[in-house]
Amino acid sequence: MMPLTAAREFMRLLTGRFLATRCPQVAGSLAFTTLLAIVPLLTVIIALFSNFPAFSRLGESLRTFLLENLLPDRAGQIIATYAFQFSQQAAGLTLIGTVLLVLTALMLLMTIDHVFNHIWGVRRPRPLLTRLMVHWFALTLGPLALGGSVLATGHLVATSIALAGEGSWVGATFARLVPTVLLGSLFSVLYYAVPNHPVRMLHALAGGIAAAIVFVLMQRLFGLFIVRIPTYTLIYGTFAVLPIFLVWLYLSWVVILLGAALSATLPSFFERARILRAFPGDRAWAAVTMLIALADAQHAGTTLPFATLQAGARVSSNEGEALLGEMRDAGWVAHTEEGNWLLSRQAAQIGLAAVVNRFALSPAAWREASDGDEASRRIAERLATALHSADLPLSALTSAGNRVQTG
């Protein structure tokens, strides 16, 4: 019963995150963006391989891998063939045209970056210059790394088949598994490196492997659907290539985003036993707990890692990131270059009332919501008075402050 309950809880968390971040709608947007950016992406990749003849075999291996494993039969391969032809003709573009192509490719990568950060609940992405540099390296070095991996595994498969024999089931099974493993590795790298959020390698691998398996199954089912139910071909004729390819892109992005949501959900799922049960004012309690820990660290002249703050406040990693992000917006905390956290002002300058006002009960918001109602206005004033009377500086709540009061 317990494993079934845990599985049900995990599916609830996964479905909640997948829908809350609007992944089905975002997948549609990414499908159209990919359709627009596919030629610019291929242009940059082909230019990279053509300018370095030593990498020509890598380029050919990458092209074969894309056609055989990432695209549906017929429609995808027709689109890819035209895209490769257009990309090769792009060599005659002017400087402005080339810049526009590169910018279009970078825009797709930046859109993916934004979507992944949203799934992980990241409030602040990397600085723009850092993102551009990361995306440029991904655009230039990524195809080389993927092409090298495909070429190396191709040699490995050929060697395995030669050792096991031409008709051996071992070689055939290995040849079928390798593309799935490569896809899983590619997705895992995406889930690990793209979000501006600490992601455990094990969680990224789990999401990547799950997405790769679902992707391969979806590819087979999609191929069977197109062959057995040729509705698009009957209605659109030759033009059926485009809607079929768009549907394929949409389903592909749904699978990729589902894998990302799975990777982002795993920490919350494993932390659920340590997370404090929800109660009125729980966010204010967690924020005060974090601030007191940071005030103690400030007194000791140290900083604290996120894991320590999260464990002390007994919140999920996503909620902890959100709380710290809001406190950073308020000017109370700051993020160090090493990845730790510290108070950005003296503990005596942060009041308990300000924290409660931001995370639990805001008299100002109550007053604004009253819409001129006299009773609501009077209640808001009394709440503000009560908060002011109960206010304490954060320094009075720290270990050092408690010792002073006790003494």
From Swiss-Prot:
Alphabetical UniProt keywords: Cell inner membrane, Cell membrane, Membrane, Transmembrane, Transmembrane helix
Entry keyword Transcription: no
Cellular component terms (Gene Ontology): plasma membrane
Subcellular location: Cell inner membrane
Pfam family, one: Virul_fac_BrkB
UniProt topology in membrane: Multi-pass membrane protein
InterPro entries found in the cross-reference section: UPF0761_bac (IPR023679), Virul_fac_BrkB (IPR017039)
Superkingdom of the source species: Bacteria
Regions that span the bilayer: 29-49, 92-112, 132-152, 174-194, 207-227, 239-259
Family label: Belongs to the UPF0761 family.
Name of the protein: UPF0761 membrane protein AZOSEA40600
Annotated organism of origin: Aromatoleum aromaticum (strain DSM 19018 / LMG 30748 / EbN1)
Upper classification of the organism: Bacteria, Pseudomonadati, Pseudomonadota, Betaproteobacteria, Rhodocyclales
